[in-house]
């Protein structure tokens, strides 16, 4: 990597002949400071040429590892010290123009980037031409972020999708041969009227459907979460944009976020034209409503763990408070899935138990391992499912040196383990598309403790971890393998039915909508008859 640019230094008065010797002395000192800290002077910087006009001193600077913003601030400090002492000349401002960054190889980057005027490939190197940067821009780490962004884009392009970096860790034995149930539970739940489509990717869960979701969730809490010492907290479900900026979700997954806007005013009279229109026309045109709300300042709960990092942000933690082990199940999460929406498996609004923890690296790894054992027992013994675990390394860990060759990966470092369950209705288990990711467990390293400035009072490194249990997907997994007859369910679920009788399903003159749906519901009632509240 190489940098080159023209730095315009505005001084406190016009340069006169008597100043030139002092300027030469100052620039000699600048030369020493531009290579300071580098064993190889080529990695530092140098002043290739200089000129002046009026009160502006102009320097052409080139450098290796030393970024131009850093070089510019070094120049400022030296000029202020030398010229201020010898000639009573002060520095009033800086402006970097015609700046160029040369990168090895061809960087496959498209689109428009801040402060970037254009790209070109010359002799196998990528040349990036930057827009002018004033002193305020140079003081901010804009150039550093830009270079990181370019690196991330290149890493993303090489890294590809998750499927390219998926490696099987462990798989259960074959239990369903042949599968006792092969129907699609998504269709059965809808046809029998247990759920009703509310909007795209949203469902209303009738009391019986809500009961089934709660059943799976409660057994999970009893078998996995509470025995490991996690305690419940309640997290907000609408987050300021600043939180998403720190977690990286706003930059990395903005296409999946659902945003929220507030009204421009609380004065109801300001809405009179709109409310009158809606009264007369009995419609709410989105484009008109949009005129009365602010630009989005929030996004709805996406990963559910974001408030955990925010809470500890800027705080000092001691050993007595560690490890911190919380979980939240207080409300829905939202993800815009576009064309991939299907049944209860892939929705915009869903419910989950989010398990989060904070501690030293050793504590975080130990907790993850305890959770992993509990998850395996939950899937294999408690729910008696066909399951598998896969190691998935998020692309952004490549930059931090945490990526290894897949044949020698180590799970005790930042990364993610996915839990997948076979859905017989999709086809044979040998087909990867027949497996559903029902949850995951992650070690983040310092990915969140650093941007939120979560610190240990003795300077020890702090890591975080999280695990998401999506209630809808786990329920679908159980029903897909076991069906709707409780006699085929594992003992823990039948015990829950006996302790907590399920409610009657809803039946109306016009609901369920179809004859086949009514038959499905009648069959379900027969299955549950010995447990229903009657």
Question: Across the structure, where does each feature detected by a protein language model lie?
Answer:
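TRNA-recognition modules of translation machinery and tRNA-sensing kinases, especially anticodon-binding
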Residues: 1-534
